[in-house]
Amino acid sequence: MNKEFIPYEQALELKQLGFDEPCFAFYDESLYFPNNENQYGTFCNQKLDVPFCSAPLYQQVFRWFREKYNLDISINTVYSKYNEILSRKYSGVIDNEGVFTNVGFYDTYEEAELTCLKKLIEIVKSNTPKP
């Protein structure tokens, strides 16, 4: 189940970008799942001190980027055949208001997913004015 949550490093970067959606778990460098939802509720970055941060799911983060920044991703399966050997790779593509960026080809879906997430963070950081 841990692979459904984004890594700690990216969760910290998202906290800096203003991600504050309710999450079912949080990081204190390692992933922490509360035992009783009624006792702990959900976690938002606004309520968590440093170094704690919420632990969002990939789908949550991708929805946030889509709704807040109009950035969308797709991960496509690409097959190739060489010398009668069929291979499968995963290609991540970011749609930035009609400008498509291919982030590469990866052996696993999860690698493509993480690379897309890192690229989304990079895009938003590069377009955010510094204080």
Where are the regions a protein language model picked out?
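Cys/His-rich zinc-coordinating "finger/knuckle" motifs
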Residues: 119
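N-terminal segment of the canonical double-stranded RNA-binding domain
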Residues: 12, 16, 20, 30-107, ...
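Short, extreme N-terminal segment that most often corresponds to the first beta-strand
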Residues: 1-27
